[in-house]
Amino acid sequence: MGPSSAFLGVLFLSGTLGLTTSPARGRLRCYTCSFAKPCDPVPRECREDEVCGVSVGTSGRTLVRWPFSRWLLSFLPMAAAATSAFLFCPTEQKEEEVIERKGCLPRAQCPLLGHATYWSRSYSLRHQCCEQDLCNAAASQPPPNLPLMTLLPLAAMIGWGVHDFL
């Protein structure tokens, strides 16, 4: 067995194992769409240092509402309502809006948090990255509803007869 046979054997073995002799790998193709709804994704080729990603942005806004404020305004004179409003504790209600965009992201940006402004509103971004062709097709799932997640185990415990032990 000569040197040329050994070289051909190594070349065949590296091809079988999926190793390539050229440094150029194919670039990823990712779906791309902006924050606008509905998202109609369009495939696009990324740059060498980019991966596919889904960026999910949340905008938390706190609204302060005074309990019984409508009742006070309708039944009491305006002056009395204005002076009595401080007697009631305000309630806070979080109103969160979620936006999403897909596209190519620099690999180094994946673990980092980001910020974006969309329609004059500020959003905190989290990135979910993947490294296969068109792997960012699926929509991200919204966070679970906290009251629902609390009630479901309680209902299951009652249904299974655990209420006897409580």
Swiss-Prot record:
Q: Which residues form the UPAR/Ly6 domain?
A: 28-151
The GO cellular component terms are: cell projection; cell surface; plasma membrane; synapse
Post-translational events: O-glycosylated. Contains sialic acid residues.
Its BP terms in the Gene Ontology are: acetylcholine receptor signaling pathway; desensitization of G protein-coupled receptor signaling pathway
UniProt-listed Pfam families: Activin_recp
Q: What is its main location?
A: other
Q: What superkingdom does the record give?
A: Eukaryota
Q: Which UniProt keywords apply?
A: Cell membrane, Cell projection, Disulfide bond, Membrane, Signal
InterPro entries, alphabetized? Activin_recp (IPR000472), Ly6g6e (IPR039700), Snake_toxin-like_sf (IPR045860)
Q: Which residues cross the membrane?
A: none
What role does it play? Believed to act as a modulator of nicotinic acetylcholine receptors (nAChRs) activity. In vitro potentiates alpha-3:beta-4-containing nAChRs maximum response by increasing peak current and slowing down receptor desensitization; the activity is dependent on its cell surface localization.
Q: How does it assemble?
A: Interacts with CHRNA4.
UniProt name for this protein: Lymphocyte antigen 6G6e
